[in-house]
UniProtKB/Swiss-Prot annotation:
Enzyme Commission code: 2.3.2.27, 2.7.11.-
Protein's recorded name: Putative U-box domain-containing protein 53
UniProt entry tagged with the keyword Calcium: no
Keyword annotations from UniProtKB, A to Z: ATP-binding, Coiled coil, Kinase, Nucleotide-binding, Serine/threonine-protein kinase, Transferase, Ubl conjugation pathway
Recorded name of the encoding gene: PUB53
Species for this entry: Arabidopsis thaliana
Polar residues: bias regions: 238-260, 297-307
């Protein structure tokens, strides 16, 4: 047989000349349905691609994508649980099944449908033209627990002739292989099963003995057939029979089984011709071998896929019966008879292979041209997009530059305006300084003559004396139509030294909301004029001098904060800090709204800072301590050194007096004793009950702060600005909240809000001719029947009414406050 193929070389040109016309190759195709089993994995994409390559060129082909969904036996609930399907839930289960099937189609099968519906390039061999077609696609989702049973039932029910399933190359011993074998054994004889795997494509078809046959490559099958016949010539069937009998297992099992595969793969008519000569056999065999060598493995596998060879079903029975004769005992005679009587078939095979090669060459040329055109189109699109991108970037760059230029101009203009304003301000300040330098410096307080002081105080009348101090007496006076307080220093303290002039000049410039304002002075006689404080001193109010009203607790907390803020201002004053030295309740004055202001600042001590840029103060040493005994710093009494912590000690004593309403003598010991056991009852016993209901937590916090301020050593006392003032600010918020809640309580209207006729608050107050105020409606009704005053009963001179806007505004304010 080898000599037959070697000596029968057929010239390719002669083979091409013997090819039939292209019009003979274009046979009309019948409608065909190809079923594809889709699992959703990457193997399904391989199945789709293979099916498109094999059947996608047919016009009347329909792809039916089949997916097997596990049988639904449970239903999900709204709470996230699942329930079994019963007869009562059958309608709900049907709706749920329909929803699941539809979602499966949308999410799993739709992407594969889009792959199938892509446009395919089809070559018309008769006209050498190309056209674009679409593959029709149907989606089918089946519900079953057995994939093989469901697919087999669908194929047999709809008489599907082609079934394509996927399988991995390692799946021979897995469950996937069992499914494939089960499907192949169960489908009808009219259906051809294609198994697409990584190793190739297997065609499974049923023969008369229901055995499975695999075909991975037509070329490999043909080579195996050729090798089985290479032991002798084509006509010498006895030699072939002896070879088969000498080794029946290898030849019968391996080679003879491939013979039906060859015939099925090429799908040619099984016509018998006994008149063919040996030379013709050799030529046809060599031509077939040459065609097999020139075609690629992919082309060899594709021989059985060409629509021109779809007559395999017509000859399946004949091939199956021929394949069944290859048994161990009957090998030699059928094989020899086949090669002897079917030389025409081999000749036909070589012709068809040549035609197939020519068709593949044309297809390859068309593919190359299509790819080249697509590549050129993509290049043109890419160049167009690149050009558009460059243009867009250029426009964006220009716009960005314009925007940056505009921002830069605006920024420069703003800087220019700011520089001009700054220069103008500096010029004005310079002019002011120059003007002030040309004029002799003046003191920043008003100077009063001694005669004005004497006249304002009625020659220092005892009736106008409102206070007495260690440095002088205080009188109430009226200077320039302004009520003020004049403090006249004793003769021993009125020497006008340079130090007094310096202190007077500096203190006249001090302005703080909680420091008594220095209005003026009479330097010749040592008189200082301050603003008048209506409610006197804190000491008088604490001890209720002249039966004055007690101060509520929330006002006391606010006073503590106000005094602390004034002390911080004095200690931070520039150029030299000021220490009060004589801070006590008698020197804290209250105005008509109980706003506290620290007085007697004019006789305080100014100390120099160690460094002009530093906030640390040097101790000031004075040989003779001044101040009130209970408020003097113990360290100052012992060493004569004074510092800002000296005022902190006096401030702590004032807080203790605000809490208890007692004298300062031994007050520290009393509060410490009450605070030792952390007993609220003991603390409440020492508090001033006239101040109202003290809040325990805030009161305990304030008492602890006061005890820290009264420590014997100054270094143990807290810092006024960093430690004391923040605590007092938080307590002030509590006090303000309590004051607001108290003022929000409804109050009784004043008597002048009432109408003399209605005995109720007036809505529209008006003044009548008798001078009294009435409600407009009430007085109008009165004057309709009377011409006398409702109050005096005297005749009314007229009936005119004048609106009392002032009283009306007061009534409206009272109503709003009490809503």
């Amino acid at each position: 047989m080898d000599s037959f193929f070697k000596n029968s070389y057929l010239d390719p040109k002669a083979v091409r000349a013997q090819l039939p016309k292209r019009a003979d190759l274009a046979a009309p195709s019948e409608p065909m349905t190809v079923a594809l089993a889709i699992s959703g994995s990457i193997k399904s994409k391989n199945v789709i691609k293979w099916a498109l390559n094999k059947f996608g060129s047919d016009k009347n082909v329909t792809f039916k994508l089949i997916h097997i969904h596990p049988k639904i036996t449970t239903l999900p609930t709204a709470s996230g649980n699942i329930v079994s399907i019963s007869e009562e839930l059958e309608e709900v289960a049907a709706a749920y099944r329909q929803k699941v099937m539809q979602e499966t189609k949308e999410t799993l099968l739709k992407p594969f449908k889009k792959m199938c519906e892509r446009k395919k390039l089809k070559i018309d061999e008769t006209r050498f033209e190309s056209s674009l077609t679409k593959v029709a696609v149907e989606l089918q989702v089946l519900e079953s627990n057995s994939v093989a049973v469901a697919i087999t039932k669908e194929v047999n029910q709809h008489l599907i002739s082609n079934l394509i399933i996927g399988r991995s190359s390692q799946a021979a011993s897995s469950r996937n292989y069992d499914i494939t074998a089960s499907i192949s054994a169960s489908v009808s004889n009219l259906c051809t099963v294609y198994v697409v795997s990584n190793g190739g494509v297997h065609i499974l078809a049923k023969d008369t003995s229901d055995t499975e046959r695999n075909d991975t490559s037509i070329e490999s099958g043909f080579e195996r057939t050729s090798s089985s016949c290479s032991s002798g010539s084509g006509a010498n069937s006895d030699v072939m029979s002896n070879a088969l009998k000498s080794n029946p297992h290898t030849l019968s099992n391996k080679r003879m089984q491939n013979l039906p595969t060859i015939v099925r793969g090429v799908s040619v008519p099984m016509e018998t011709s006994s008149t063919e000569s040996d030379e013709t056999k050799k030529r046809s065999s060599d031509a077939a071998e040459e065609a097999s060598k020139r075609s690629s493995p992919e082309t060899s596998r594709s021989v059985s896929w060409n629509p021109q060879f779809r007559d395999f079903d017509e000859r399946k029975d004949a091939m199956s019966s021929m394949s069944s004769n290859f048994e161990y005992g009957n090998v030699v005679t059928p094989l020899g008879h086949y090669f002897t009587d079917n030389q025409d078939t081999l000749n036909e095979i070589s012709k068809l292979r040549a035609e197939l090669r020519h068709a593949h060459e044309m297809y390859a040329v068309a593919q190359v041209e299509t790819l080249d055109a697509s590549r050129k189109l993509n290049e043109l699109k890419f160049e167009e997009l690149t050009l558009l991108e460059h243009e867009t970037k250029g426009i964006a760059k220009k716009e960005t530059e314009k925007f940056e230029q505009k921002r830069r101009e605006e920024r420069e203009a703003a800087q220019r305006r700011e520089a001009e304003m700054k220069a103008t301000h500096e010029a004005k300040e310079k002019e002011k300084l120059e003007e002030s330098s040309l004029v002799a410096p003046k003191l920043q307080y008003q100077e009063f003559t001694w005669e004005e002081i004497i006249n304002a105080t009625s020659s220092f009348s005892e009736d106008l004396k409102i206070g007495m101090g260690a440095y002088g007496d205080v009188y109430k006076c009226n200077l320039h139509h302004t009520i003020a307080a004049v403090k006249v220093l004793h003769s021993a303290e009125s020497s006008l030294s340079k130090q007094f002039d310096q202190e007077l000049e500096i203190l006249s410039k001090i302005r703080h909301p909680h420091l008594v304002l220095l209005l003026g002075a009479c330097p010749d006689h040592g008189a200082l004029v301050y603003e008048y404080m209506e409610n006197g001193s804190l000491e008088d109010r604490l001890f209720q001098v002249n039966d004055s009203q007690p101060i509520p607790w929330f006002v006391r907390l606010r006073i503590a904060w106000e005094v602390a803020s004034a002390l911080v201002f004095l200690h931070k004053s520039k150029p030299t800090p000021i220490i009060h030295r004589d801070l006590k309740p008698a020197n804290i004055l209250l105005n008509h709204n109980f706003v506290s202001k620290v007085g007697d600042v004019g006789l305080s001590t100014m100390i120099q800072a160690a460094d002009p840029l530093s906030t640390k103060f040097t101790m000031y040493k004075q040989t003779s301590p001044v101040g009130t005994l209970c408020y003097i710093d113990p360290e100052y009494q012992r060493t004569g050194r004074i510092s800002p912590k000296s005022d902190v000690y006096a401030f702590g004593m004032i807080i203790l007096q605000l809490l208890t309403g007692q004298q300062a003598m031994a007050l520290t010991y009393t509060v410490e004793t009450a605070m030792e056991n952390n007993n609220d009852d003991e603390l409440i016993q020492i508090l001033d009950e006239k101040a109202g209901n003290w809040p325990i937590e805030e009161t305990r916090q304030l008492a602890a702060l006061a005890l820290q301020c009264t420590e014997l050593r100054s270094k143990d006392r807290p810092d006024l600005e960093d430690q004391i003032l923040p605590v007092l600010e938080s307590l002030k918020k509590v006090a303000d909240k309590a004051r607001n809640s108290l003022s929000a309580a409804p109050s009784q209207p004043p008597s002048h809000f009432f109408c003399p006729l209605l005995k109720d608050v007036m809505k529209e107050p008006c003044i009548a001719a008798d001078g009294y105020t009435y409600d407009r409606r009430a007085i109008e009704e009165w004057m309709e029947n009377h011409r006398t005053s409702p109050v005096t009963n005297s005749p009314l001179q007229n009936v005119n009414l004048l609106p009392n806007h002032t009283l009306y505004a007061a009534i409206v304010e009272w109503r709003n406050r009490n809503q």
